[in-house]
């Protein structure tokens, strides 16, 4: 069943439907869920690049006791969302890109 759930959450990202963001966040935050499923949800959030995922991704990364696949995927997704939103802001104003990554 784990493979089916991984496929389901990653497919939500590929469908590019931002209505899935709240559900993906809940899966990712669920400590009782398999870590590979949670990592799949984190990856899908990175594909969707929705700002609503930034805080939950940040919390997962900061509260991690160790850096495994879940945390690594969350960090990559966080960076993707930050980069996408930074590029969108560039058109609105001229600012220097932060160097915190």
Describe every region a protein language model picked out.
Residues 17-29, 50-62, 85-96:
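Amphipathic alpha-helical scaffolding segments comprising HEAT/armadillo-like alpha-solenoid repeats
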Residues 2-3, 18, 33-36, 51, ...:
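Alpha-helix N-cap/helix-start positions at coil->helix boundaries
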Residues 7, 23, 36, 40, ...:
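Alpha-solenoid helical repeat scaffolds
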Residues 100-101:
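Short, solvent-exposed mixed-charge patches
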Residues 11-14, 44, 73, 77-80, ...:
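Core register positions within helices of long alpha-helical scaffolds
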Residues 13, 29, 33, 46-49, ...:
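Amphipathic alpha-helical interaction elements
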Residues 6, 18, 39-42, 51, ...:
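N-terminal cationic amphipathic segment used for targeting or macromolecule association
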Residues 1-15, 19, 23-24:
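Eukaryotic tandem repeat interaction scaffolds
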């Amino acid at each position: 069943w784990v493979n089916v759930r991984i496929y389901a959450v990653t497919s939500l990202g590929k469908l590019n439907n931002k209505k899935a963001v709240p559900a993906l966040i809940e899966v990712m935050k669920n400590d009782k869920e398999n870590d590979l499923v949670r990592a799949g949800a984190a990856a899908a959030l990175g594909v969707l690049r929705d700002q609503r995922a930034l805080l939950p991704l940040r919390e997962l990364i900061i509260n991690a006791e160790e850096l495994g696949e879940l945390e690594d995927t969350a960090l990559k997704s966080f960076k993707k969302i930050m980069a996408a939103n930074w590029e969108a802001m560039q058109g609105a104003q001229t600012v220097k890109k932060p160097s915190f990554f």
